[in-house]
Each structure stands twice: as structure tokens, then as C-alpha cells.
């Protein structure tokens, strides 16, 4: 049973969340974004079953968020969901004061990339079934987000003058092309036409479940996202072209891409040594 289905949500919350999701759909938010946002509100609803969504105060929201030991990125995502929901509720006239309007922004500390090591990936590939093996290979070879991988369809495989590529629909509905090698393309071409990973979410597997399977296969805290870090770091090491990596990952900002690309210690040592060349000869 999914986490969404285990939550107890009262009808007054369900109605409000459903109306809000329609607004998100109208605004062109992706399926993954809508799922994440509504899941956050369902968790809030589950923990406030004796209250209407329009009864909660700023203090209630702050107390609720403070009670959870979330990673900074997760905390920022929850804050964004609350802010979006209550801004909509205020605009619709459900409340006269937006309780999330003055919630403090969440500071994200600068983190080093965490690319999954080759030995971890190789070991996982030797011990998983064919479906999970395909998930890991696609994520490792393309750097796709888990949601993009979960929605992968055979019709997204294309060929141009330079070779095979995948046409990926990313965040905000933006398209990008990811070149792939002939071996992965040949494997995808052997699949029957349709979703690469069939499931119960409009015919395909959910991003959450795909991520769970990959994390379980990799072990030791490695995830689908660390495969994305791995792809970014290796791609950058080949050409040292951060803009190329940005396009491959589908980032709106190159600043985000820099967070994903691991710079080897040897490179930093060479750079530091180069800065001091000739000083002692003077």
C-alpha cells in the first residue's frame, strides 16, 4: 500500500485538495509535481484530522513542520506546498489571512554531489531482476529523474544522423534530447510498444515505487538521484562543458547543475598547484 493510501484524510480536506489539484493542473504543473504537492497536503490533513484546512494558523504550520526531521530540500518542498495551497485558498476566499504567507524561507546548505560509485552500480546489476536492471541502466546512462524514467515510453526513442536519443519531457513540460549508446537503444527496441515500465499510474509505474526499487537494489543509502549525480559527474569529466551537462539534465539554471557535478580531488589539487607555479623560483 502506498503512503498516500495509508493517510487518513477527512472529506473537508479531500474536497479542498481536489479543487487545488485542479488549479495545479490548469496551471500546467506536471503529474509528478501534482502528486508531490497533494501528498504533502494529505500528510498535513492526516495530522490535523480534527480541523478544517481553513482553521489552521501560522503557529500550527510552524509547529507541524518543526516536528519533522526532514532534510533541507524536503523541508523547502513542504514549505512550498503549504505556501501554494494557502495562497490559492486566500485567493478563492476560503480564508481572510494566509497562514503560510510569512513562513520563513528554508535555507539549503551547500552540499557536495554524491555520485553512486561504479562498484555499487556493478554489484546491483549482478543481483537484480531484468526490470530493475533496466531501471538502473537507463538512469545511469541518461541521468533522468526517477519520474521521467517511470513515464518512459518506447515512442520516445528516436534516431537522427548522429545516432539514437531519447526525447524526454521534464519539469514544466520542457523537452530535451538525451543521446544514448547503441546497446541501450537496441535493448529498448526489443521491448513491446508502450510504457517501458508498466504499472497502475495511468498505465506506468509510479516514480515513488521506481525509486524504492532502485534504492533497495543499490543499498547503503544510494538512490536513483545518486545515479543522476553519477551521470552528471562523469559527463562533466569527459568534456568539462557545464552547459552541455545542464542541457542533458534539464536544469533551468547552471547553478543547479554545478551542485550535481563532482570535481575529483586530483583536479582540485592540480588547480591549486597551478596557482603556485613559479612562486618559489622568484
Annotate each PLM feature:
Residues 1-9, 276-282:
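C-terminal secondary-structure termini that scaffold catalytic or DNA-interacting sites
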Residues 95, 118-146, 150:
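Basic, Lys/Arg- and aromatic-enriched nucleic-acid-binding interface segment
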